[in-house]
Amino acid sequence: GRDAYIADSENCTYT
């Protein structure tokens, strides 16, 4: 959940 454009396995963040 670090980058808004990468679907992080721990926290998918799409801002």
Curated annotation (Swiss-Prot):
GO terms for molecular function: ion channel inhibitor activity; sodium channel regulator activity; toxin activity. It comes from the Eukaryota. Coiled coil: none annotated. Residues 2-15 form the LCN-type CS-alpha/beta domain. Inhibits tetrodotoxin-sensitive voltage-gated sodium channels (TTX-S Nav) in rat dorsal root ganglion (DRG) neurons in a concentration- and voltage-dependent manner. Lowers the activation threshold and produces negative shifting of TTX-S sodium current activation curve. Induces shifting of the steady-state inactivation curve to the left, delays the recovery of TTX-S I(Na) from inactivation. Its main location: secreted. It comes from Olivierus martensii (Manchurian scorpion). InterPro entries: LCN-type_CS_alpha_beta_dom. The keyword RNA-binding does not apply. GO terms for cellular component: extracellular region. Belongs to the long (4 C-C) scorpion toxin superfamily. Sodium channel inhibitor family. The keyword Secreted applies. This is Toxin BmKNJX11. Expressed by the venom gland. Keywords: Disulfide bond, Ion channel impairing toxin, Neurotoxin, Secreted, Toxin, Voltage-gated sodium channel impairing toxin. Has the structural arrangement of an alpha-helix connected to antiparallel beta-sheets by disulfide bonds (CS-alpha/beta). Contains 4 disulfide bonds. PROSITE patterns: LCN_CSAB (PS51863).
